[in-house]
Amino acid sequence: MEIQMSSKQMPLTQAQLSSDMFGAFGPAMDYAIDAAQRTVLFWDVMRQRGNQYREHLAETVPHVLSYEAELIIDGRTLPRPVNYGLVRIVPPKGVTIDPQRRPFVIVDPRAGHGPGIGGFKAESEVGVAFKAGHPCYFVGFLPEPMPGQTIEDIARAEAVFLEKVIALHPDADGKPCVIGNCQGGWAVMMLAAIRPELFGPIIIAGSPLSYWAGVHGKNPMRYSGGLLGGSWLTALTSDLGGGKFDGAWLVQNFENQNPANTLWTKQYNVYSKIDTEAPRYLGFERYWGGHVNLNAEEIQFIVDELFIGNNLAAGRIKTSDGVAVDLRNIHSPIVVFCSRGDNITPPQQALGWILDLYEDVDDIRSCGQTIVYTIHDTVGHLGIFVSGAVAKKEHGEFADNIDLIDTLPPGLYEAVFEPKTDSTPGADLVTGDWLMRCEMRTLDDIRALGGNDAADERRFATAARLSEVNLALYRTFAQPVVRALVSAPVAETLQHMQPLKVQYEILSDANPFMAPVAAMAEEVRKNRKPVASDNPFVAMQETVSKQIVAALDGWRDFTEAVAERTFLTVYGSPALQAAAGIDPADTRPLRKPPKNRLYQELVQKRIAELKSHIPLGGLREAVVRALIYTGMGRGSVDPRGFETVRRLRTRYGDLPLSEFKTLVREQYFMLLIDKDASLAALPSMLPAEAETRREAFKVIKGVMAACGEPSTEDEKRLSEIGRLFGIGEQGATIPFLQIRRVPAKAS
């Protein structure tokens, strides 16, 4: 019986064709050819990476900004010279800047890498600021520090930079919004505590401020200082560098936190996607390999005062002229952006300072502070300020709603993001694809993230004391010998021998053995034969890769568990704690900064002043007070209500944003101090004209409606406000004399 072949047979895949031609060996041959070609192309990418590294370091001002920039201030020309500079980012073609919008100033981290990551691509912190119409400035740095420069010198230079930005934008509707990434975040917070008048809203992304914080079973990086015996090793490394600390060691420390990615995944992604992955990989490696140096004084301050000493939140850092760095002095709203997927700055380290400084939310309010935080579920440390998706969502919403954040009443909020849809109430009032809602929180919400108990605090305090002892011993007995042996040529040689730098150098054209790779890669590209995706050997390759990652992750988990157990056991020893001057039985907080008695007296004086102002004001003050009261029942603020409220600035007298912010805060505090008196005073603040009161109440209802379906509590509060405004249940106006209870006073 003959079998007739159909003219409409399904097309054969490459793997099936190979099987037909070579039998069972076909897929194996295809895979072998592809693997050989990928190997050549992979090593050529590594060669390009090495050449790129050498070219980048040869630049006068190496950076990875994807925008054109013009120098405004060179920090090397200041009275206390530093290697920092202020540049203006030139808006790209097609970007329109509103001269009345507050400028954004982005401070990049100097933590081993060069500057520019905040403007690495279009979808970045710079990009979203431009999209929202803001002028944008950037604070960067050179690879080599100025002789003798200190962290305080850098802070003073950044103050000069901000003064210049403010002077360049006299018509802006607010002080600059300053973004600090990673190390740049804590540096910005220190400056804001000393010079609060220079700042608008502050956004700190992936920035540690509470360096001991964390939870057991995670966050092992915080144990490093204790396990190494303290900061003496930092001093030794600086001495071996001839008075400079090679930032490549910081980069290597980051890489050690994720051995699977460092040793395998990063390279495997290039190898397995060799035809498409190279440009993205090389673009990032340009930043990752752009190492910079720090002075010995700078890195020693960072390690001693911050990472081991944990003195920032405790208020124990002082400037050279004796001014204490107290984060409670910051008057601007603080936005904290962190992630559960960040193993460098976990949420506990980004937010723990709030628990260190304040007893409760009322304590935050008494300092006049507004703190907004948001926690991403998965993104890693670099993704917080590199990821395009994060830039479009979180950073984009921060930029679009920066005025809303600036006018939030004091307190603690969490920024929650919801996708905007056609069914979103008031969608036309929402800019972008997301609705950012600021929900009121308490300190219990921060505590729920987990953290240290009293025993953990004693362990870290003991490690800090031991670090001081070991550093003193090193400086007394070993440092003079090391410095005598390490001449400038020796220091330079040791710097070139740093393991990460060797990787870049050896896989570049500087190595004659790499010379044939470029020609071989060119031939491969001409005759490229990628394997089919359904080849069984590709599936085997993926399986092996996953097993390697799992093995490396298992090794990491094992070593981290051993490190944690060692730290907890050694520094939990009552004998060692007693020897270090730490009482093993003490359960009191070790790092609570003292209350400023003068400040407390000023707070009480301000409360009395606000109480006396409760009956004062006119229609504008009454409407704002009523809006705040109705919104307090909802427990959240979002851009829809704010966009509606913004119109009040023109309807009831155009107020500058700074004055509008003051008005909102004063009315909010009055409601907190004495809600009953504040509400009872509303009728006396309203005009006698029924139509004016009716229109004002319509505005309040419009704001409530813009924020979505009102709750029962919202309806109750709105009804109460309606009664006070003289509006009956059916919208009828109550005769003014029937609602006027408090004698009018001058505005």
Language-model-detected regions and their locations in the chain:
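Short beta-strand/loop motif that positions the catalytic acidic residue
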Residues: 330, 336-338, 342
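Conserved alpha/beta-hydrolase "acid-adjacent" motif
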Residues: 344-349
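Small-residue-enriched hydrophobic alpha-helices in membranes
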Residues: 583-747
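Alpha/beta-hydrolase-fold enzymes
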Residues: 2-45, 167, 171, 188-297, ...
